[in-house]
Amino acid sequence: MEGPVKLILLDFDGTLADTRRANALAYAATLREAGYPLTEEEYLGRYFGVRCDEFLRSYGIDDPAERERLRLRKIELYPAFFDTVELNRPLWEFCRQFRRQGGRVWIVSTGSRANIDNAMAHLGIGGPETPEARCPAGRVDGILAGPDVARSKPAPDCFLEAMRREGVTPRETLIFEDSAVGLEAARASGAAYIRVTLPE
């Protein structure tokens, strides 16, 4: 990496927050309601980090209307499992310090905006619309969610779009990611990246 970092891009699920169990339980409950026998272990082993529509399609749900219905139902059920979500506090504190020194921080995720906003509110870290008075230094500068770009990870589009919106180059950007598809997207973006591994 050459020159100072001006922008940090964070994946959300599995990087900034450990949402593995909450996502697995919410998807399992959603699909069980619809008669599909997904287990928590199967979701975590094969699908965690994959955009919802792609996951449901690869799971064998071909009807787009049914996939959309299940996606919306999962968003409804997801907050019921937030007691299992944990903030990656060292990474969050690092990003807060980076922002205090003038850097910019975005969340760039394949997840839905509603899921990210709900989880951030639960964790007490707010989102870009949270007034500073209510959440001092606890904001991010932007959020790009799955539907905001045409091609999801492993394509680098989401990272490149966040850089474009901030007016920075890949050489001025640092990405934190956990999943194989996210790391592939980070590499393809041309930015420096750090792999995050959360404890089991």
Region locations from a protein language model:
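An amphipathic alpha-helix signature
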Residues: 24, 28, 40, 49-53, ...
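Helix N-cap/coil-helix junction residues
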Residues: 36-38, 61, 125, 167-168
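Active-site neighborhood of HAD-like aspartate-dependent phosphohydrolases
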Residues: 1-42, 188
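Conserved hydrophobic/aromatic "anchor" residues
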Residues: 10-12, 78, 159
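A metal-dependent, Asp-based hydrolase signature
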Residues: 34, 48-78, 97
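Short, acidic loop-to-helix structural element flanking the phosphoryl-transfer center
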Residues: 79-117
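Asp-based, Mg2+/Mn2+-dependent phosphohydrolase catalytic module
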Residues: 1-6, 96-99, 112-200
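Short beta->alpha linker loops
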Residues: 22, 47, 51, 73, ...
